[in-house]
Amino acid sequence: FIINKFGYKFFNNNKVLRLLFFTSIRGMSLNKIFKIRNIHFNTFIKKDDEIYDDEKKRIVKEVRKKGYCDITNYIGIKKEEINEVKNYFKSQQLYNGHDPLQSDLKKSDYSEIYNNNSNHEIFNNGYFSYDAETSLNNTVLKNLFYNKKLKQISDLYCGFNTEPYNICTMLNIKKEIKHPVTEYHRDIDDFVSAGFFIFWTKTDKNNGATTYKVGSHIKENVEN
């Protein structure tokens, strides 16, 4: 009602309203969410051609079209930084679910990840995670979380001044399993948002999510 009456920009600029109705979006249909999203995009999408940096322009336009874009070369994470991150998380305790809140809330050491054989749909099913504090205590990740180049892409795509609000680090072992988080699904946290995924190791069908649905950010139904 509020967005229909006053517009998305009014809602987005009002922190009180956003806090009050943060979870309300989960009760809305995809069709209604996409309608609000597309109306917002159409107010500034023509300005994409005015983006002064060619690489930023390419990335934003590709994300608008496909819903995702490989920005490996744009962000330029160094090999030694990748190794540092991997070694860091091997030394930290983790939870036995793809998200700490989707676990039994008990921390364990990295060395124990192959010891759990529960038949629970989510817990001990090959997926593990670290809390946000653990992730942000790593210098490489903290610098990426507040990275100006990533923020610029987010601002240009969303059409307003964005702020990072969540960080999730997930680990999964090589195991032929079916897990709810790797089945095709859509997480809609806001009407307009941008997410950045970093794969610190190689992935395949038994080790990490590897497929994105082209157009699933703007269409309710997409082809397989």
Feature annotation, model-predicted:
Residues 4-10, 14-65, 71-182:
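Non-heme Fe(II)-dependent double-stranded beta-helix
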Residues 50, 205-224:
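Double-stranded beta-helix
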Residues 171, 198-199, 212:
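Hydrophobic side chains in beta-strands
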Residues 175-178, 202-205, 218:
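Short, charged/polar surface micro-motifs in flexible loops or helix N-caps
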Residues 183-188:
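A generic local secondary-structure boundary/capping motif
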Residues 189-205:
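Short, conserved beta-strand element in jelly-roll/cupin
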